[in-house]
């Protein structure tokens, strides 16, 4: 379905500067293309953290994803453009309307949460402002898409689309979502890179935090054909990712930083493929 080669990213956040630098350097050594960071007041700010990451290793960096309601559109566009400039184009700007936890956080920063439509318009305004700031240098855009309106926006504006469904969504439904995206994108379809995030990879038992992340007990999640898991030997995992590329079109695979080493053999097996 897709002629794109695979690339791999690591999603995490720093607890200390030394630990963050070690993670970034290790990701680069293992062949990952990108270090990504989520956004939220419970975490360090992603923008200086990613600037630090880009300074310690020759690797791409990205927000995964910036919560639009936590900043004004002008502020977010300014931060994103600054990273594009400082990294010499190695920054990928992921932005979304914010997870439910961000509603209380907007109160803490003195900004309105807004309706779903207002938050979506905030994303659009941010992208428009970033385009003006970038000039001839264009920052790649990542958008998450699950519902019809988000899918339409992603089809029109995104370079990378992360298919935003929960851990229990059937494989057939995700494939249908990807097909709908390609239809909406029309002539842009081949220019859009499909991303898929993994909670876990390899053979280690799932940790307790996977219930918080997925809403499903680890044992139950293991019994499902969840696309947020990639289990088995390195060759089995590589074969499964090639099946996902063929049936869904996903070629940009991101993994939780806790599984950086577990996915590394797969990164090596699929290098250049």
Predicted regions and their residues:
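Active-site-adjacent structural elements that line small-molecule/cofactor binding pockets in enzymes
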Residues: 1-273
